[in-house]
Amino acid sequence: MAEVQKQKLTSVFIRNFVFGAEDSLVSTVGLLSGIAIAGTPRSYIVLTGIVLIFVEAFSMGVASELSEHSTEEYEQRHEVGERIPMLGGLVMFVSYVVFGFIPIIPYLFTESAAALRYSVSISLIVLFALGVLSARLSGTKLLRHGIVMTVMGGAAIAIGVAIGSFINIGG
């Protein structure tokens, strides 16, 4: 029984860690890329990114907890097993905050045009590494999973850049 509980804890942890980290990286770098390319001042880019991270981390953490809780209620009614809702929410929140700051860091130290390149490059590298880590934890193909996660993140960045270019407020 203890082994089953450990597997459930591990499953909740992996699911929420990967989801929070991937969603935070993709959302944050997509948003920052879009507003940076639109000519937004660097201080606004940083402020927007930080607000996004904490609002989304809380939202995702709560959504994870509520989702896990609903699943737990269903499983109890159908005698499927136990889940740990609060753990999932906490892991989601923490991974979202930690990984969300990765795309912001370049904007703290360099001007916006260079920061945009660094932010996108670093985020894509981290997405690839996260895909590989996720594949390793789940026992699937490392390279394939890394590439898929990188391509999906790249698509979000492209959307942010396209919208930011279209709405360009800087001139």
Where are these regions (language model features)?
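Membrane interface segments of multi-pass transport proteins and intramembrane proteases
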Residues: 108-114
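Structural signal for membrane-spanning alpha-helices in multi-pass inner-membrane proteins
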Residues: 103, 107, 130-135, 160
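Single-residue recognition of alpha-helix boundary sites
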Residues: 33-34, 67, 74-75, 107, ...
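Interfacial loop-to-transmembrane junctions
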Residues: 129-155
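Juxtamembrane boundary at the C-terminal end of a transmembrane helix
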Residues: 161-171
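Alpha-helical membrane segments in multi-pass integral membrane proteins
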Residues: 119-126, 149
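Hydrophobic, small-residue-rich transmembrane alpha-helices and their short perimembrane loops
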Residues: 1-102, 116, 121-122, 156
